Each structure stands twice: as C-alpha cells, then as structure tokens.
Swiss-Prot record:
Organism: Vibrio vulnificus (strain YJ016)
InterPro entries per the UniProt record, alphabetical: MbnB/TglH/ChrH (IPR007801), Xyl_isomerase-like_sf (IPR036237)
Gene3D superfamilies reported for this sequence: Divalent-metal-dependent TIM barrel enzymes
Protein name stated in the entry: UPF0276 protein VV3194
HAMAP family, per database record: UPF0276
Cited NCBIfam families: PRK05409.1
Family assignment from sequence similarity: Belongs to the UPF0276 family.
Coiled coil: none
Length: 291
C-alpha cells in the first residue's frame, strides 16, 4: 500500500459521486468501504474503476441488502452476487446489518428493526451462519439505528446482538452514531449499551452524522449520514478507543455528499483522536501512534 499519510485504521466510505476523485487523485488513506450492492455487475464502469482502486486501497464490503432478519432466509441470487464480488475483490472486511428488509419477495427501501425475541434470534443466527458458510469467512454485524420497537421484545438490542455473536462467531461493527441516535429515540443510556457489547469482538467502528426532525409528539433523531459527526459521537469514540484500543474506523457520509476534502477532514479528526489515544496508552512507545 502506498497510501500511508493517514493512520492505517482510518477509512472513508466510497460513494459513486466521489469515484473519479479517488480513482485519479488517490487520497492517502489505507482503506475504503463500499456498499456491496452497487458493484454486483462485474462489467460495469464503476466496478472496473473499483478493481483498479483495489490495487491501491484495502476494500471493505458493507452490505445493505442481505436482510438477515428475514424468516424466509437470504435471497440466493443476492448471496451469489455477493459471493462473486467477495471472491473477486478479496475485501478485508464484509459486513451487513442487524435488520430485515425483505418479506415474501417484497423489498422495503429501509433497514427495518427486529423484534428481540428468541424466535427472531434463531432466524437471524441461521441466516448469518448460512452467509458465513457460503462466503467461507466471518462477517461483521452492525447495530442499527431505530425509530420504533416491538412490544413483544423480550430482551434488549445489546443482549440480542451479543447473543448473535456468541452463537455464530460473527464479528461486530459498532456504529457509535446509531447507538447515540437510538439511545435518544428509545430512552436508554449509551454507556449501558457500549459496556454490554463484547469489545474483543468489535473489528470496525462507524462514525456518521444525524438529523433532528420535529414532530407533533416531539423530536426524533434520524441516522441520515448527511452531516458531520456530532461532538457527542466524537466523545463516545474517544472514550471507547481509550478503553478498548484502536479499531478500523470509518467516516460514513451517504446523503448530501460534501466535497472530498470535507470527508477527509472528518477522517483527520478521527485520526487525531486515535493517535492521541494510542500515544496516551503507550507513552514509552510513540511509534505505535505513527501507524
């Protein structure tokens, strides 16, 4: 890898409007995260560009369409296309969400929450194991942002996610913005959630921005990925890495995309916190903070 200016754990989401910039200018990052479904067509222009960029960057494949919570199972054609992409790119991480978005062949344009019950847990774990068997690797499961919850849930989201990890040996993608947004929407404490998640199983952290929407009943916070990372989420990140150490960290920005320089400035903020934490935890070994 020739891109060594940023700490190697810091990456950004590669979105199609930024393709040309990354392809031609190669900002000095070690890795990029893609939305897997955007690259299922092997002969598309953007897939060919990605193949060339993969010679200079590590790639993480982040899915939004496996619908791992669907009782009917994972769509076999979707899984086949994902497997072909993973086999071709050999990404260093593959991830999807603790959610569902398909039922009986009908697809919803959102990542919908699960009821946190034993039945839903069995379905979700069965689907994760099926995907991991097909890909021949563990996948990362990301905690969702949510705006409603089911009255018949019997355990918390963090208990559900922890049990998924235990039963499937999957890895975890900890989205700190999602924790913060859901904590406000549902009235739980962020620290309760974060302390319950097995840190040793977290391989990646997502950082993003959110939007506040006013309703007649009050405010709702929405994980829009259209804003800079909030000060409160930066604080959660700083606290988490101080306690648990460095992880691959992604700046996620999907809507109202800014210029690439704005995205890289957010990445630089993450890097500054990460290097400071590494240096603080290893004061006699400053080289650890140099990447």
């Amino acid at each position: 890898m020739s891109n060594t200016e940023f700490h190697p754990h810091i990456g950004v989401g590669l979105r199609l409007p930024h393709h040309d910039h990354f392809h031609h200018h190669r900002p000095a990052l070690s890795w990029l995260e893609i939305h897997s479904e955007n690259y299922f067509q092997p002969n598309s222009f953007h897939r060919q560009q990605l193949n060339q960029m993969a010679e200079h960057y590590q790639i993480s494949c982040h899915g939004i369409g496996l619908s791992l919570g669907s009782v009917t199972g994972v769509n076999p054609q979707h899984l086949l296309r994902l497997k072909q992409l993973v086999d071709d790119l050999q990404p260093f991480l593959v991830s999807d969400h603790l959610s569902w978005s398909e039922n009986g062949g009908h697809y919803f344009n959102d990542l919908l929450p699960l009821p946190y019950t034993e039945e839903a847990l069995e379905v979700f774990c069965r689907n994760v194991l099926h995907v991991q068997d097909a890909l021949k690797r563990p996948i990362l499961i990301e905690n969702p942002s949510s705006y409603l919850k089911y009255q018949h849930s019997t355990i918390s989201e963090w208990q559900f996610l922890t049990e998924v990890q235990r039963r499937t040996d999957c890895r975890l993608l900890l989205d700190l913005n999602n924790v913060y947004v859901s904590a406000f929407n549902h009235g739980f404490d962020c620290q309760t959630y974060l302390e319950a998640i097995p840190a040793a199983c977290v391989d990646e952290i997502h950082l993003a921005g959110f939007t506040i929407k006013s309703l007649e009943q009050g405010e709702i916070w929405i994980d829009t990925h259209s804003q800079p990372v909030s000060a409160e989420v930066w604080q959660l990140y700083q606290q988490w890495i101080a306690q648990h150490g460095s992880r691959h960290t992604l700046i996620e920005w999907d809507l109202d995309l800014p210029p690439v320089d704005v995205l890289l400035n957010e990445a630089k903020k993450a890097e500054t916190l990460l290097r400071a934490s590494l240096l603080h935890n290893n004061p006699m070994h400053p080289s650890l903070a140099l990447g």
